[in-house]
């Protein structure tokens, strides 16, 4: 929708999502994080019998009419995720995220905190200082991607930028927060959920589209998994002629990317039977 709308505003113009689109993006990112925390994390971190589904089903964040800054959602997160009031938790995370997250998982009795505590030995040992996909305000990075997507249909299966494999995720929106290992990446899901719960206007996640001329446009949005890019080209009658999607997964699971490098490092960190 954003990419098509951008075609109507003229070449070189930036089109931003409207209020309903921003709300939909915010809801979906928040819910995706909650599902991953309470559905996937217990199984993947070796706690498959943890009774998480009843908690998730009762979460106000899954209600169809969820609105920004929901007090019910904030109270639920304080009880079942943070184990403490939200404001001091956020203050601690913003002041010294590394030290705060370590202190929090050792003190909080909540399921997410205890799962992270159990993942610390392995996750902390898996170091990853991979370059991240960063989008500039002028759209230069997106325009570079559009050149590749136009020239090569296979580009989206093995993307690169300037010959480099990049990664993207909620940790790549962390700004000055140092994210150098797998454990901190897992913990950033908690921080992201908390920041999203306090968002009052849907400004936490960025999205937009650029009109590139000649019936071509490129759109992006920040999702729970990272930056999602859509590129399209229409013919003279306005019908979609070519269309490509560049998902966060393609960056993160590139054969020479961050996950592949971490998997190669596993035999050095754990016994062969554990791998």
Regions found by a protein language model. Give the residues of each.
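Short beta-strand elements
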Residues: 228-247
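Active-site bordering "gate/hinge" segments
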Residues: 1-225, 251-275
């Amino acid at each position: 929708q954003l990419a098509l709308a951008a075609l109507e505003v003229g070449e070189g113009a930036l089109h931003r999502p409207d209020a309903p689109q921003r709300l939909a993006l915010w809801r979906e990112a928040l819910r995706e994080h909650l599902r991953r925390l309470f559905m996937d994390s217990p199984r993947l971190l070796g706690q498959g019998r943890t009774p998480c589904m009843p908690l998730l089903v009762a979460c106000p964040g899954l209600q169809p009419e969820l609105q920004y800054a929901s007090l019910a959602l904030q109270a639920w997160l304080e009880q079942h995720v943070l184990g403490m009031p939200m404001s001091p938790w956020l203050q601690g995370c913003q002041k010294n995220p590394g030290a705060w997250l370590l202190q929090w998982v050792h003190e909080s009795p909540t399921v997410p905190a205890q799962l992270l505590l159990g993942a610390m030995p392995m996750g902390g040992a898996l170091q990853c200082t991979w370059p991240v996909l960063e989008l500039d305000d002028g759209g230069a990075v997106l325009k570079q991607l559009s050149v590749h997507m136009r020239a090569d249909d296979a580009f989206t299966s093995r993307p690169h930028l300037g010959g480099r494999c990049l990664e993207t995720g909620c940790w790549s929106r962390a700004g000055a927060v140092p994210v150098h290992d797998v454990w901190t990446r897992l913990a950033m899901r908690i921080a992201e959920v908390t920041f999203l719960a306090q968002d009052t206007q849907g400004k936490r996640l960025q999205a937009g589209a650029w009109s590139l001329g000649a019936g071509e446009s490129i759109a992006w949005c920040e999702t729970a998994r990272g930056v999602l890019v859509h590129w399209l080209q229409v013919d003279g009658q306005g019908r979609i002629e070519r269309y490509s999607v560049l998902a966060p997964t393609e960056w993160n699971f590139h054969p020479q990317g961050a996950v592949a490098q971490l998997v190669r490092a596993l035999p050095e960190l754990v016994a062969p039977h554990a791998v």
